[in-house]
Structure formats: structure tokens, C-alpha cells
Amino acid sequence: MKEKKNIPTTQSLLSSFDGSRKVYEKGSRPDILVPKREIALTQTVTQAGMIQNEPIRVYDTSGPYTDEHAHIDVTKGLNRLRAAWVEERGDTESYEGRHVKPEDNGYRSRNGSHQHIHTDFHHKPLRAKQGACVTQMHYAKKGIVTPEMEFIALREGLSPEFVREEVASGRAVIPANINHPESEPMIIGRNFHVKINANIGNSAVTSSIDEEVEKMTWAIRWGTDTMMDLSTGKDIHTTREWIIRNCPVPVGTVPIYQALEKVNGVAEDLTWDVYRDTLIEQAEQGVDYFTIHAGVRLRYIPLTVDRVTGIVSRGGAIMARWCLAHHQENFLYTHFEDICEIMKTYDIAFSLGDGLRPGSIADANDEAQFAELETLGELTEIAWKHDVQVMIEGPGHVPMDKIKENVDKQMEICKEAPFYTLGPLTTDIAPGYDHITSAIGAAMIGWYGTAMLCYVTPKEHLGLPNKEDVREGVIAYKIAAHAADLAKGHPAAQKRDDALSKARFEFRWRDQFNLSLDPERAMAFHDETLPAEGAKTAHFCSMCGPKFCSMKISHDIRNQSEEVKKEMEKKAKEFISGGSQIYSS
């Protein structure tokens, strides 16, 4: 008997955080409604009375899952938010698309045992009409401010024209495949909020479709800006379809993983035709950006021989093995213009993979890493000629003193295309805590100009992350990204910090919890020692107690100072009313 598969459940996510509600900021047209999370604040108690604190609105990535008025059926997918915008431009056409094959899900025949859950995903793919280009970069270069750009401007608190200029210049990308209309437009660029990405996906050893969909909804709840499906086991196509149809943020993939599954895991058997078919398959599903390791060139491979950890990128290692087996140049490099044609047909952004990134501190900033970067700069300019959007992937494992060099070189070589880095990890000695070792590097590299940070979970180097690991990784990277925004002086970045600091000083405990990145954990830690409801208004916590709380003492000093000030003012008035005489006769 076949194992019964569960329908992915999102019931636990259909509510907002305590003290918050979903609100929408209206644009210039009725269908531009930009989601934000509004955090209600309690009043400040003073000796003179109560003072109202205005609510704080924060950037929100959770989609309709935290909207109490939304109806969600994961077997049907989310509402097609951008469908009308794409259609009204008049430069796309629908078509039948390719048929799903057994090998798309990792099976050799249609008799393969795969996970099947009934869905109502009626998704007929779109493509650009003959001779048309449908990329956001193309529109931006023509001076067109698209609805996507206006949506982003409202999200970021900037002007639509500024968004258009950044996309036109290549300094920012809007990952928005025309076949992923469910996504809420967002932007990746160093002059915007630093973004984070969360990786999910099954492996040949563990996980299932429902687990991965739940991880996706969990990650966006905690704040991931994009999602990468890195599935390498069975049911890759089906898992990806479920994720994309239910995902309100851009979805990226590494197509070489699925292409390898189609040739039974034998890298030497990969061909351009297999890879091209995989690109089109994923493009039709709606993948918003592809990691493509076109910079791993045959002549660079010997540069990795003396490394401590060799080639640590899965995609990089696959292509290096293919190049050596055939003693030919990387077919992703030789067919790069062909790939550009596919990308511009669906508006898929390049995430040019760093297949030779350092996998250890000892290998950081070496010849192999920077040789590949030179090729990525070359490929960036080719893609831009096709009006295809590009971001550049970066390391990896880099000690703190070598981080800035990575950003400086990338900016120069890749003409300021957005940088997207994995960490970097700043030390190699902390398995189980690499969300911390990497968040240190992520905060620094974000400050220096990296546009998006790929999260690392506590399971890095140890195993496939579960739901709780995803939460840990996302929160660690939200901290890093926000710290970078503060350091760069991003408009409004400090507003939430100031609100929380004020709530902390005024002992408004619930406001402190609600304003934090992880309200549930903040309250749980507080309640471990002071669970009573009265403790939520107490002027101390269990760390210092009522007599040693520095903030309580500060309040006392302020009150005393106010009394002294009033007494001094009283004496001054008496002095003046007495004729301002210093001595009396």
C-alpha cells in the first residue's frame, strides 16, 4: 500500500503576530496595495498623564498568510497579484508549454512512486512574443515606470523614478518571472534595504513536499525576502510547483541540480540539451532567478588544487568534473548568449554563481576565487546587452580583515551589479553555530555594500535544516541585514530601534516583545522567570531585580532632577520678586 501523503498545512500561520495587523498602502491604481505590518504601541505613563505612542509600520514579507481576512487554499495557490500588470503590457503570449516528464521528478518511468497530492494549479505558461523583451530592466531602460516599480517604491519609502534608474543602471534587480504572478514585487540593490535569502529543499536522504512548503511559509513569516529551492532528491518538479504557487516572495533555483538528476547523477553525462530543457521547465513554472555557474572555466580548475578545501560549491564541483572529463570549456560559458535568450523571454534574473568560492578561511581571496570573478564581470556585461538582470554571488568563508576587499573588487569588476553573498563565515571552528559565525560577516559585508545575504542555519555543514533551524537562520540574518541598514544610514532604518528603546526605558514590556524580530522568543525568555501578568508592567526584570535596575534608577534620577529644577525655578522667582538683591539690609 502506498504511503498516504499529507496536504501541506498552513493553518498555524494564518494569524499575525501579537499586537500587529496587516495593513496595505495604496498606490496610484486600485491593484497596487503594498503590505506592511503595523505594530500597535501602548501609552506612555508620565506624572502629567498618558501620552499616546503612534504605531510603527515595518516591511513585511509574509504575504497573505498573516492577513486575518485572507482565505488560503494551498492546493489552489495564492492570488495572481501581477497577472493583470503582465497582460496589459501586451508583449506576452500563453502557450501549451512542455509536458512534465518522469525524469523531471527524478524517475525513470511513469510507474515511479512519487508523491501525488491533488491540486488545482491551472498554470498555462507565458512567454515573450516573438522579438519582444519582457524584463524589468528593458522597461526601465526605456523610461517606463512599471507597476512593479511603483509597488517597490512604496515598500522602500523611495520614489518610483529612483527605483527605475537603479534597475536601468544594473545596480538593482527586480526578480519577477512573468509566470510567478503570485509574488509581491521586491528589489535587490545596495541603495535599498539589505535583503536576505533562505534556502529550503529536499535531499536524496530526507524531507517531503509538505515539509518544504511549510518551511517556505515559515521562513517568509520570519522575514526572508527571497527563497531558493535547492531540492536534490525525488519530486523536484512537484515540490517546486507547490512552493512557487504558494510563495509571495521571489523563488530562485540552481538548475544544474535537477539537470544532474535527469542524467542519474552522473556529471559526465550532462549535456547542453538536458540543461536547456531544465531551464525552460523551470522558467515555465515561474522561477524568478537562476544560479548559473558559468564562471567555472576549464583553465581555472587547476588553481584549486592546493586549496585546503578544494571546490565546495555543489554546482561548481559538478561543472568542474564535467570540464575535466571532456577536457572542454564549461558549456554554461559557451552557451551563455543562448541562456540570455531564455532569461529575457520570461524575465528571469541571473544569479551568477561563485562556483570557486572559498570553503575555508585558509582559501579566502585566493587566485581561483578572483579569476572566476573576472569572468563573472565579463558575463554581466553580456547579459546587460540583452537587458537581462544580473546579480553576482560571493563567498563563503572569509576572515573579517579580508571582507572589504571582496566588495571592492566585485563593485569594480562587475560594474556595481548587486552582490549576493553566503555569509561570509568569519571562522571555521563553530559547527552548530555557523548562523552566528556567518551573521558576523554578513553584517560587515552588508555594510560595505552587499545587496542580499544568503542565510546560514545552525545545521550548516552538518545536515538538512528543519523548520526551527530555518527560523534561527532567518532571524540571525534579519539582525545582520538590519545592522547593515543602520550603518549605511538607510532612511527610516532606525525608527523601529528607537521605538523599542523607548519602550524598554518606559518598561512597556509587551511593546518591547512586539517590536522585536522574534516576539515569541522575547516574551518566552522574559516569562521563564517572571511569568505573572503583573510582571509585564513591572519596572524591572529578573536580571537586576527591583533595586538594581539601571533604568529604574535613571527614572528616579530624572524625577529628582525635575524636582530640583522646579525648586531652583521657585528660588529664582523669589529672588527676582525680592528686588534681585544679593544682600538684604
Swiss-Prot record:
The record lists the catalysed reaction(s) as:
5-amino-1-(5-phospho-beta-D-ribosyl)imidazole + S-adenosyl-L-methionine = 4-amino-2-methyl-5-(phosphooxymethyl)pyrimidine + CO + 5'-deoxyadenosine + formate + L-methionine + 3 H(+)
Source organism superkingdom:
Bacteria
This protein's cofactor list reads: [4Fe-4S] cluster
Residues the entry annotates as binding substrate: N199, M228, Y257, H293, S313, R314, G315, D354, G355, L356, R357, E393, Y420
Choose any GO biological process term that the UniProt entry carries and state it: thiamine diphosphate biosynthetic process
Q: In which pathway does it act?
A: Cofactor biosynthesis; thiamine diphosphate biosynthesis
Q: Which EC number(s) does the record attach to this protein?
A: 4.1.99.17
Please give the Gene Ontology molecular function terms for this protein.
4 iron, 4 sulfur cluster binding; carbon-carbon lyase activity; zinc ion binding
List residues binding [4Fe-4S] cluster: C541, C544, C549
- Kindly give the InterPro entries that the UniProt entry links to this protein: ThiC (IPR037509), ThiC-associated_dom (IPR025747), ThiC/Bza_core_dom (IPR038521), ThiC/BzaA/B (IPR002817)
- Disulfide-bonded cysteine pairs: these are none
UniProt function note: Catalyzes the synthesis of the hydroxymethylpyrimidine phosphate (HMP-P) moiety of thiamine from aminoimidazole ribotide (AIR) in a radical S-adenosyl-L-methionine (SAM)-dependent reaction.
What PANTHER family does the entry give?
PHOSPHOMETHYLPYRIMIDINE SYNTHASE, CHLOROPLASTIC, THIAMINE BIOSYNTHESIS PROTEIN THIC
Q: What is this protein called?
A: Phosphomethylpyrimidine synthase
Taxonomic source organism = Bacillus pumilus (strain SAFR-032)
Tell me the name of the encoding gene.
thiC
